[in-house]
Amino acid sequence: MSSNSDHHISVEHTDGVATIRFTRPSKHNAASGQLLLETLEALYRLESDDSVGAIVLTGEGAVFSAGFDLEEVPMGPASEIQSHFRLKALYYHAVIHMLARIEKPTLAAINGPAVGGGLGMSLACDLAVCTDRATFLPAWMSIGIANDASSSFYLPRIVGYRRAMEWLLTNRTLGADEAYEWGVVNRVFSEADFQSRVGEIARQLAAAPTHLQGLVKNRIQEGSSETLESCTEHEVQNVIASVGHPHFAERLAMFRSKEMRSSALAVDLDAVCGGR
């Protein structure tokens, strides 16, 4: 996809990694209706693209995303404004649901401030990394609307109930180090190293078996709301499904071969397990 002025995102493919980049730097990469629909369309295409093993979301310029594009809010009566936000919320939620559903791992590469719905979209990704100058702000209180973009779902699960309440009610800005401490991001990198480190992580994700990553995503998402009995039963079902996949047959054959037994992986396993 081109990144010209006709589009609000670009999509780049490198080494099995697809990067969805928000390309509205003059608008702080605010989420216009077009940006959200283009992102959703891109995710649908990438879901069925076998050449893609991982998906990165990032922003062009100095900002990840400023959330809702308030310049699109109509000047009409309250009912018209409510209809506008209802439609935009549906777009946002469709993107977030797709990020949760897609088997391929998603990585939020937060290159600058993540605000409001931009923060929400980053929370919906499987992993998140940021530059050391990134900041994180709920912002919903600032503009007079209730929190959305899945923040009610993901924040308590990621940072815990007390911190989620504190953050949303006080509306304070978190810097990169505090965001890391709270678990909002997995890693913080210097701005100079950011792109290369994002590439390393994304390529590592892309190299892993997609079907297994999808099973992991499903279990982590569903397991937190299940009983222990239900969770372990679903794990057994996933194990049975995975050992019936050709990938497992290949790995088992490799493990049984002399080449595998003499590899570094086998040595590490022997060391850990006390083998000879």
From Swiss-Prot:
Pathway annotation: Xenobiotic degradation; 4-chlorobenzoate degradation; 4-hydroxybenzoate from 4-chlorobenzoate: step 2/3
Keyword Cell membrane: no
Temperature-dependence annotation: Optimum temperature is 45 degrees Celsius. Activity is lost after 5 minutes incubation at 60 degrees Celsius, but one-fifth of this activity is restored after cooling to 45 degrees Celsius.
GO molecular function: 4-chlorobenzoyl-CoA dehalogenase activity
CDD domains: crotonase-like
Enzyme category, top tier: hydrolase
Keyword match Phosphoprotein: no
Chemical reaction(s) catalysed: 4-chlorobenzoyl-CoA + H2O = 4-hydroxybenzoyl-CoA + chloride + H(+)
Entry keywords, A to Z: Hydrolase
Residues holding substrate: 66-71, 117, 261
Residue positions of the active site: 93 (proton acceptor), 148 (nucleophile)
pH dependence per the UniProt record: Optimum pH is 8.0 in MOPS buffer at 30 degrees Celsius, 7.5 in 0.1 M potassium phosphate buffer at 30 degrees Celsius, and 7.4 in 20 mM potassium phosphate/2 mM DTT buffer at 30 degrees Celsius. Retains full activity in MOPS buffer between pH 6.5 and 10.0. Is irreversibly damaged below pH 6.5 in MOPS buffer, enzyme treated at pH 6.0 in MOPS buffer only regains 40% of its original activity after re-equilibration at pH 7.2. When treated at pH 5.2 or 10.1 in 20 mM potassium phosphate/2 mM DTT buffer activity is lost completely, but is recovered within 17 minutes following readjustment to pH 7.4.
Pfam families for the chain: ECH_1 (PF00378)
UniProt cross-references to InterPro entries, sorted A to Z: ClpP/crotonase-like_dom_sf, ECH/Chromodomain_protein, Enoyl-CoA_hyd/isom_CS, Enoyl-CoA_hydra/iso, Enoyl-CoA_hydra_C
Record-listed E.C. numbers: 3.8.1.7
Record note on quaternary structure: Homotetramer.
Described purpose of this protein according to its UniProt entry: Dehalogenates 4-chlorobenzoyl-CoA, 4-iodobenzoyl-CoA, 4-bromobenzoyl-CoA and, at a slower rate, 4-fluorobenzoyl-CoA. Does not dehalogenate 2-chlorobenzoyl-CoA or 3-chlorobenzoyl-CoA.
Family the UniProt entry places it in: Belongs to the enoyl-CoA hydratase/isomerase family.
The protein's name in its UniProt record: 4-chlorobenzoyl coenzyme A dehalogenase-1
Native organism: Arthrobacter sp
